[in-house]
């Protein structure tokens, strides 16, 4: 076995990103690397309990003591000689972790890959496996379950090829904050460092225009990262005394909290940013060409029967429902409004796991931690369990409105083949429930009740999931179902982004040679295209920013008008953008 001594610090990192393996810090089962790798495989989550607990812990905010005094601002309370009362706050942690989303901050996932490449080399087998992870990431909806799985499998892939030979592991890197879940989200789902289409699926730039396309895509990337960063930073204000103000927030001319200044400036130009990477704009669309959304809808209709036939023939094991259980574990009490025994059990399990990991590993994880995060490993620090695993969520915001949350439980179900079809049938049943003019919202509860009576649920393929699907739907609540299926733009794009052919119709370990050839072809082709153009994503993130940071009615009206025009060009129909903007989040 080759042995490598780690350097401190490593190139591009303030602290070592990987650590030397010991019997206590890798945690992999003996058979973890024995089978061929398939990306987004819920069975892999059972191969390392230590890593699972680490990622769950790393998805929570950290509280540290801070001084406050009633009727004194944050800046004044820091002055010498002021007798301050101590309280706990997540503000400092949020501000440190939020720096990951700065435009001029290097991608630490890319830096990690470059470090491994220079120190150990990248084998063709690793490249093929990583290509499958990237391809399925582009075909998945942005949600907490997908982000958790991407982080877990990134560590899995690196350890699969480098743990045994070089005695190094990435297990522990998230707990030590040398990597963060925001790094994973940025690399795989926000900037998407491996994407090759410049944000315009199926459209090749004219010769000589490649540089301009990269600049346009960078502007899009800055915009969506600014929205997520602003949403994250706004969490800290909810824990402060009302008399305190944060330097990064201000009151704009509308008289309403506008969010951090970079976001306010970005929102003012969202339409120009979107137009440059919108496949429906006159600059990119030629006569007879369908938009990305129209193409995705057409492909989904064609593939549904193919997937049903596939599910009829396949024998599913218990691990197939792993992502449903993961969704309940991560989002119970966070994105749910109705409580039952399963959701209560999930909350207790999650909180217990986070606290146990912190108590057992705090001292170990304080070694080699980056300097700016050292204070968050002290005895006085502790995980903030009230917000749940918020760093895994798409928008990282704690707002609730109209019995909805910024993170959607139903989006998480799109990663499961059975549930992808079940949600489509569920929507059809709601639409067909009444032959009269009964509102769509009023049709939801009766359909939920009808599906609850069927055990197992009667579909065109075996669907005995032991009640998981209907449990999650009930826990989310009728408002969240209405928002997901008919109202919310981010949910609509998550459905369009989900590519069932890539997620569910690839070769399996039943024919390993075909599987390995498939992965090798993905790597050789190096064609990683999204399913939804970056212009639509710009609109979706702008919509979320308007929900989280309300504007004046005149600004809202202009935004709804411009956004509605773009949706019509893409043939996307949603119920009342005005209602969704003001009543949901």
Curated annotation (Swiss-Prot):
Residues 107-193 are annotated as: Zinc finger 1. One of its GO terms (molecular function) is zinc ion binding. Residues 1-25 are annotated as: Disordered. It is found in: Host cytoplasm; Host nucleus. The keyword Zinc-finger applies. Zn(2+) 1 binds at residues 107, 110, 187, 193. This is Packaging protein UL32. It comes from the Viruses. One of its GO terms (cellular component) is host cell nucleus. Zn(2+) 2 binds at residues 408, 411, 484, 491. Its main location: host cell. It comes from Varicella-zoster virus (strain Dumas). Residues 408-491 are annotated as: Zinc finger 2. Keywords: Host cytoplasm, Host nucleus, Metal-binding, Zinc, Zinc-finger. Pfam families: Herpes_env (PF01673). The keyword Nucleus does not apply. InterPro entries: Herpes_env (IPR002597). Plays a role in efficient localization of neo-synthesized capsids to nuclear replication compartments, thereby controlling cleavage and packaging of virus genomic DNA. Belongs to the herpesviridae UL32 protein family.
């Amino acid at each position: 076995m080759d042995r490598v001594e780690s350097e401190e610090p490593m190139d591009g990192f303030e602290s070592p990103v990987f650590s030397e393996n010991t019997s206590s810090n890798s945690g992999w089962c003996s058979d973890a690397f024995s089978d061929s790798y398939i990306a987004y495989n819920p069975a892999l989550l059972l191969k390392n309990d230590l890593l699972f607990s680490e990622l769950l812990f790393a998805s929570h905010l950290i509280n540290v003591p801070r001084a406050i005094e009633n009727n004194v601002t944050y800046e004044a309370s820091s002055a010498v000689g002021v007798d301050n009362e101590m309280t706990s706050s997540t503000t400092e942690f949020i501000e440190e972790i939020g720096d990951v989303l700065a435009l001029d901050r290097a991608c630490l996932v890319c830096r990690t890959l470059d470090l491994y490449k220079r120190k150990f080399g990248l084998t063709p087998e690793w490249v093929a496996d990583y290509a499958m992870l990237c391809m399925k990431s582009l075909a998945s909806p942005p949600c907490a379950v997908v982000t958790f799985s991407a982080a877990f499998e990134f560590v899995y892939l690196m350890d699969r090829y480098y743990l045994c030979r070089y005695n190094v592991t990435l297990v522990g890197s998230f707990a030590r904050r040398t990597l963060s879940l925001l790094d994973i989200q940025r690399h795989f789902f926000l900037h998407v460092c491996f994407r090759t289409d410049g944000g315009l699926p199926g459209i090749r730039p004219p010769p000589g225009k490649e540089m301009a396309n990269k600049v346009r895509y960078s502007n899009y990337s800055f915009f969506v990262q600014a929205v997520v960063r602003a949403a994250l930073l706004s969490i800290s204000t909810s824990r402060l005394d009302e008399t305190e103000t944060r330097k990064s927030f201000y009151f704009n001319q509308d008289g309403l909290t506008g969010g951090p200044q970079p976001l306010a400036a970005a929102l003012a130009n969202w339409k120009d940013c979107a137009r440059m990477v919108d496949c429906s704009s006159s600059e990119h669309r030629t006569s007879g060409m369908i938009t990305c959304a129209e193409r995705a809808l057409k492909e989904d209709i064609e593939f549904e029967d193919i997937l049903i036939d596939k599910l009829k023939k396949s024998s599913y094991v218990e691990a197939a429902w792993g992502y449903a259980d993961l969704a309940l574990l991560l989002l119970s009490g966070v994105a749910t409004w109705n409580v039952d025994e399963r959701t209560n059990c999930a909350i207790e399990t999650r909180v217990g796991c986070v606290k146990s990991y912190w108590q057992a590993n705090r001292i170990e994880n304080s070694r080699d931690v980056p300097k700016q995060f050292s204070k968050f490993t002290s005895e006085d620090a502790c995980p903030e369990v009230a917000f749940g695993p918020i760093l895994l969520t798409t928008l990282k915001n704690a707002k609730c409105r109209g019995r909805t949350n910024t993170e959607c439980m139903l989006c998480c179900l799109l990663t499961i083949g059975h549930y992808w079809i079940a949600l489509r049938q569920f929507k059809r049943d709601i639409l067909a429930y009444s032959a009269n003019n009964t509102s769509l919202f009023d049709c939801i509860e009766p359909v939920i009740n009808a599906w609850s009576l069927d055990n197992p649920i009667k579909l065109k393929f075996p669907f005995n999931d032991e009640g998981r699907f209907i449990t999650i739907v009930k826990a989310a609540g009728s408002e969240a179902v209405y928002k997901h299926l008919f109202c919310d733009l981010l949910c609509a794009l998550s459905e369009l982004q989900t590519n069932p052919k890539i997620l569910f119709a690839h070769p399996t370990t039943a024919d390993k040679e075909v599987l390995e050839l498939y992965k090798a072809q993905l790597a050789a082709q190096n064609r990683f295209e999204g399913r939804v153009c970056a212009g639509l994503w710009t609109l979706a993130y702008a919509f979320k920013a308007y929900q989280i940071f309300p504007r004046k009615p005149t600004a809202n009206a202009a935004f709804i008008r411009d956004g509605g025009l773009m949706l019509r060009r893409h043939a996307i129909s949603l119920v009342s953008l005005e209602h969704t903007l003001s009543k949901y989040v």
